[in-house]
Structures are given as C-alpha cells and as structure tokens.
Amino acid sequence: MNSNFRSLMIWGLIALFLIVLFSFFNGNRQRASNGEVSYSEFLQKIDNNELKTVTIQGQKLTGQTADRRMISTYAPRDPGLVQRLNTNKVNIRAVPESSGNSIFLNLLFSLLPVLIIVGAWIFFMRQMQGGSRGALGFGKSKAKLLTEAQGRVTFKDVAGVEEAKQDLQEIVDFLREPQKFQRLGGRIPRGVLLVGPPGTGKTLLARSIAGEANVPFFTISGSDFVEMFVGVGASRVRDMFEQAKKNAPCIIFIDEIDAVGRHRGAGLGGGNDEREQTLNQLLVEMDGFEPNESIILIAATNRPDVLDPALLRPGRFDRQVVVPNPDVAGREKILEVHVRNVPLAPNVNLRVLARGTPGFSGADLMNLVNEAALMAASRNKKVVTMQEFEDAKDKVMMGAERRSTAMTQEEKELTAYHEAGHAIVALNVPVSDPVHKATIVPRGRALGMVMQLPEGDRYSMSYLWMVSRLAIMMGGRVAEELKFGKENITSGAASDIEQATKLARAMITRWGFSDMLGHVAYGDNQDEIFLGHSVARTQNISEETARMIDAEVRRLIDDAYKTATKILKTQNKQWLALAQGLLEYETLTGTEINEVIAGKPPSRTQGSDTAPLRTSSVPKIGAKNSKGASKSGDAEETEPSVGTKATAASSAKKVVKNASAKSAEKKASGTQVKAATPAATSIKATSAKVASAKAETENVASAQAATENVAMVKAATANVAKKSVESAQADDAEKKRLEEHNKSAHNKKGNLTAGAASNTEDEK
C-alpha cells in the first residue's frame, strides 16, 4: 500500500511539474511574440504620445500603452532618449540591470527537458528491474542476505529427514570448527545439491543450516540471473561471489538451480544463449583458477536429470543429498512441529494421522494442519478435534465437496453403482489396499470416488498388486454395463481407462511383465528438445514390436475386465446393497462399507451426518459392539475366587445350562465359568450339600448377569464365598484340595466340557 501510494505521488509531482513548465514557456513565448518592436517604432510611439510609462533596464526598454499593452525593444547608446521622454511627458521607471542569473536561468530552461527525459528513463528502468541500484545496477547480484529479522530456523524446526540432517551437520561443524577437519587433511564439500520432490523441505533445510552455523547466508533464485540484457547473468554471478568473499565464511543458496543450470547445447537455432553464458561463469566461480575456500554453495532442485554434467561433478557439487517424502515416523514428527501453536483436543492422535497419510510431503502435512485449524474455527470450536483432521485429510486427498452441484436421480444412481463396483472389486481381489472411503458427493472434478489408503509406505509393487489394481479400475465400467446395459454406459470411466492403460503399458514396456516381450525395456521417445538432448534420436522399437506391445496392453486390460465382471456377478448382493447404502448415506467409510454389505446399518452417532472417526487404513483396536470379546477380556483380568462345595455346585448348575446351549468356541467366556471350573471336578464329593447352598443361587445369578462389570463380579463372588464358607462344614483336607485345584484351573480351560457333562449326569 505504501509503495503504491509513493509511486502515485511521484507520478503526480511529475505531471504537475510538466504542467507548470509548459505554462511558463508558453507564456514567455506569447509575451515575446506580442511585445517585440523595433527601436524606431518605439521612438515613433513616444513622439505620438502612445506610451504612458517606459521602464529602462540597461539596454532594454519596456513601454506601456494607454490600453495597457506592453511593448519592448533594445536601445542603442542614445544620450537624448531621456530628454525625448521628458519632452513627451512619459513616466520614466529605471530598474537595475540583472546579473548573471539570466544566463543561469536560460541554461537551466534549455537543459531542463533533457534532464526530465533522463530522469523518467532511470525511473522506468528501476521499476522494470525491481529496484536495481541505479541505472547501472543491472550487473549487480540480486542475492539477499538473510538476517535474524526474517526468523531464525534451526534443525529443531526440521523433522522427518534425519538422514539429510546428518549429512548437512558436517557442513555446520566445518563452519564452526574448520581446524577439526583441516588437521586431518579433510576438505569440506564445496557444493551440496539438495534433490527431492516438491514440498519435502529443501529450502527449509538450507535455512536451518544458516541458523545452526550462524554465518552470513545469501539466498537467490535461479531465475534471478538471466534478464533482458546480454551479459547480465554472468555479471551477477561474479558480483555474487565477490560479496560472498567479503563475508567469508558464508553460505550461498540457489533455489531452483535448474532454471540456470540446464544441460548446455539445448534448443534449436544458432543464436546466443544467455543462460549458457551464465552457467559457464557459475562453473568457473565454483571451481576455477581462483579458489573460493570457506564459501559453500547449496542448491535445491526437483529436476536433477536436466542439470549439466559439468555442474554435478566432484569439486563443484561434491555431495548430493536426497530429501524424500517422510515415512510414518517422519510424518508424525512433522505433525508435532506444525501443531505446536494449535490447541488440540484430547482425542487427537498424531500417530494415527501419520499412518493415514502415506505419501504426504512436509508441505502437505502443513496444509493438512492448517485446513483442520480453519475448519475448527469455522465451526466455532475452541480446540481442533480428530474430526477436523479427518475432514481436512479428505479435503486434501479427494478435493473439496461440491454439494451445490445439481445431479439428477439417474446420475446419482449411476454414480452409486459405479463407485460400488470399484469398492466391491477392491474388497475381493487377491491383493489390494484397504478401502478408506466411498462417496457419491462430487469432490474436485469427480462426481464420486472410492479412496484407498495403503496400510504402510510402499516402495515397490508386485505383479499381483498391479493386476488387482487394473481390475479395481475396471470395476466402475463393469458395474455400469451389468446394471444399465451395454448401450447405457457413460463416459464416467474415462479417468479409470486412462489410468489403467498407463499402468498396463508401464507393466509391459518398463517392468518386463510380459512373457511374449521378455525382460526388455521398450521406452518411448519422450525426451524434450529443450532438456539438452539431441533432437534426432533413433527409435529402437519396430512396428511389429509396437503392435505386440499394444496387444499385450489390451490383453492385460481385457483380463482385468473379466476379473471385475466375475467378482461383481459373484458378489451381486453385496454390490447392490452397497449401492443402495451410498444412495442413502452418500458417504461411507471402510468400516461402514463392511457393515452395509453385511446387512447392518452403519454405526453412526445420532444427529450427526459425519462418519465416525475410524478408517480402514487405521483400524481401531477391538470391536465396538462385540460383547463376547469384552467379556473374555474382563474374565482374563479377574482371578477365580475360592468357593465352597455348595457354592461351586450351585454355580455349576447355572453355567452348565449356558455352556450346553453355546458353541465350544465360547469356552471360559465369563467369570462364573471360570469359578465353576474347580467345582466341576468336585461335584460328586459335594452333592450332599447342594440343598444347603440353593439359598445362595439368587446371589450367584445376579453376579452372573453383571459379568461386564468386573468389580461387581468380584464383590458378588466374594459374598457368595463368605456365606458358603460359613454354612459349609467341610474338613480342612477338602478345603486344601479345592484351593490347589482353583490355582491350576487358569491353565485348564479344556476341562470345561468334561466337567459340564459330569455335572449334567449328577443333576439327572
């Protein structure tokens, strides 16, 4: 705002000055053209009494007529002029003659237009060059010195790239203690090239080196060298290294060096390439006749394949540090860095988020945290919950929802069956990533989608996985054909077909997955002219081989189509159920998809349109509605109580009735079953006291009904044991035998069936 206002003020002052100057020159010219007369005419007007006043200024005479018109002339040396004026009764005014100011003003007025033109040219060039230092500042380096005011970044602010940090730590140590390395004859790398995909933190790593080493740090972009004038790029490279030598030891960071370091000899035509001249100067400065010790050049690029080989050789870029996408542990650390200033709810689990975001870069994770914070603020929440993180993850991965898109019922049905086909095939192929979410709500440029998330980071793909992936891609088109007929299929599978063709061709031409073509790479000629490669390259694929490649690609896709057709016909009920579920709920998570195809409604919280916070890629531990599992877990934590014969007998009667009705898989599923285990072996010896223990049956039944509450079971069992001990008159040997048997009953769950059978016989 200030710079715009300043520019506006400058333009306004220039315009005002030009207007005043024009008025001044124009007025003088008009006055000069209207009042100039000859000396004879001036004398004649005096004699004719036409002049009322005459002003004498040296040799200049200025007269005023009766009608107030001004005339002027230059008089020679005329001694009788004053007498003549007095004779004609003319009012005489004498003005002292001016000094050399008139000469100066005349010179100024003559040079002023030239000065204005030169000033305007300088102003325009400064604007075009982005504020270069003066009109002759084109060749000056545009490298900026990073200061503390711009924020100090250290290695603590960089996470997820531990190997890269270790490689760069040596540079920091050298800048701090150069004698440590020089004592053993070591030489620090003169240049370090950071290579990695976009968003992995290459620039942040460079800034952290400057913060750790505490040395001057110059930063410049690769596009800041070459501009409109010839020779500017090379001049800026020289000036940049001259500034670095004055501030040595220091670091120079060139971001996106591929803009200036591309392979030489690229392009068509024989004209001069300013970029090549700049690159040559950079090569000389990095490793030429003049050594540049204590100057470390760090560069970053995501296109190392297009760089000139001379730039990558040892002595210039001695070390190449790869900065890949982070793994699970790295993503968790990156999330911890980005949530430092974000208030989180207690249910936020960064480990779960890291597992559910495979392939995310550091920039993607930063965007994820920012989107979650914005969603929480728009929902008027004081903290960011796990729901916001899940919604933000879906928005980043699948695109923003477009619920305003008007879709007809026919389009919704077609989309639902299409996406259900993808999901059912994904659930039934041999190898596949878990289904994370299926939706028919338009997101991004798609009307619907099925999202799959791998359970972990994948670094290689198997043949079976690729074939299964092809079948999943064909699932949507197969579903349309089976449901609506071949004549009613739509263009909705265009993206699926394109991706399937690309994958199948890569399987044949790059990865050798064809028995007919063998383990040979048949790469297409995709090299671009301006990447420094030769224009004319021979294609090593014959027409017959090209036809074979097309046939093999067609075969893989046809096989995938048949596989998808077979799966959807076999799992027809599940497919139809899932399609109806999508029409009803619009969006289903992986867990909800399994519930829908099993004939159950999705377990969602009432009054909420959103899905529960769980995904198939990050499953929850334990089942939510599995009562048997929860009972068995409680039973394992509860120790069996010591009961008397009467208590054991009454407990055995209750448990045996349940055990005979249940399957053998639910052995030892409750606390009462465990408590009945020692009783089952001693039921014959205690049958005489069964009648006296029947009074405690109600207490045991109430304890059995409360098996989910471990504390209540323990209290009820202790109460039963206490009352049974008081009523029982067993001898000490019998009690000792029962206690020993109870201790060993934990590891003898298999005796339940035999004990239950003996109990049944005794009861009869």
Curated annotation (Swiss-Prot):
From what organism does this protein derive? Bartonella bacilliformis (strain ATCC 35685 / KC583 / Herrer 020/F12,63)
Q: Keyword Kinase on this protein?
A: no
PROSITE patterns on file: AAA
Report the cofactors. Zn(2+)
Name the Gene3D superfamilies on file.
Answer: 1.10.8.60, 3.30.720.210, P-loop containing nucleotide triphosphate hydrolases (3.40.50.300), Peptidase M41 (1.20.58.760)
* Residues involved in ATP binding: 196-203
The ranges of region (Disordered) come to 596-685, 721-764
| Lineage, broadest ranks | Bacteria, Pseudomonadati, Pseudomonadota, Alphaproteobacteria, Hyphomicrobiales
* Pfam families given in the database record: AAA, AAA_lid_3, FtsH_ext, Peptidase_M41
Q: What processes does the entry annotate via GO biological process terms?
A: protein catabolic process; proteolysis
Family of the protein in this entry? In the central section; belongs to the AAA ATPase family.
**What is the role of the protein in this entry?**
Acts as a processive, ATP-dependent zinc metallopeptidase for both cytoplasmic and membrane proteins. Plays a role in the quality control of integral membrane proteins.
User: Where is this chain compositionally biased, Basic and acidic residues type?
Assistant: 732-743
Output compositional bias ranges, type Polar residues.
Answer: 603-618
**Where found in the cell?**
Cell inner membrane
Which key words are in the record? ATP-binding, Cell inner membrane, Cell membrane, Hydrolase, Membrane, Metal-binding, Metalloprotease, Nucleotide-binding, Protease, Transmembrane, Transmembrane helix, Zinc
UniProt xrefs under InterPro entries: AAA+_ATPase, AAA_lid_3, ATPase_AAA_core, ATPase_AAA_CS, FtsH, P-loop_NTPase, Pept_M41_FtsH_extracell, Peptidase_M41
Q: What is this protein called?
A: ATP-dependent zinc metalloprotease FtsH
